């Protein structure tokens, strides 16, 4: 009921609210925008400062109630803006912050439930301000009911203001995300799967919402960011507990997808996207390094173990916005080096892999019109075939007269072919080299 009243108050036309509306000057609009940003930053920094420093000696139950009071204060600010000032921007900011702070409240209740369920076996963070142990079951139950009630009411009001068109989708996603956040599970082998599932669920919702132009405005972006907050809280919380190989891989995969693909939906800043691209690239490489560290003993590491790094760089070169040619060039150099060491050490399947990789590099060079992968691919193919030169020599020595006859026939046929098609061969060679010169 309260949320509906807030909606009705906020969507009233400005002409009905103010009988004689006045036009706000550009300077005033800028000042009010800066003031709103300043106020939001002050609220967030103050809350973070309190969590980190100001509540070390406060009992866990009181910490929750202080945070709850701050959330209610933000909602009260939204009501004042909506009913008293008849102003929408401030109300959106207050209720948006209130919805975001509720995820923090959910994480606190989750810490209480986990500490009670696990008892002395609970894995507690090293920081006292993150420990919520020794809270009575009755108080935990009350906190859980209050948090659940506020989660629905505040989220309903917030998403109604920010993106009323997609209220059901946002509310449903928020409830599921916070429900997973409250689970009393900290197992290093289970949490990564929960994080991965929640991430892809939120990402699917995010992609659906992004297709609506209204959700690309500031209000829509804020609503989309709020539903993702439980995921980032869960990731941050998992880093405070014993890590695992699965967690490292899952977080790295999320970083790759977010930095290479998803961040483009939020910003067009060249600097941010450039930095994010390198973070995503390093995360992709870190995935393979983590797999090697987990499953391969250092004494069994060969040069071929690092071939997937070249594959990763080449695959990313088709998705990144900056230095795509550099990615392919580095990938080609790595491939050449690995093929060289594999062939010189006469590793099993080295010539076959060298020929196969060389063909792929050659095709890529033709597709992207680049010299490095094309020439590198030709070198790999030639090196792979030269590896079998020893077998050709052995064949020749075992039956020299047959080999000599076959070689003589091949030489005569080659001479006849060159003589009959001399002009075509020269013309096509000239076209070939001119085309190669025009490539990057």
What are these regions (language model features)?
Residues 1-440:
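Alpha-helical multi-pass membrane segments and their bilayer interfacial helix-loop junctions
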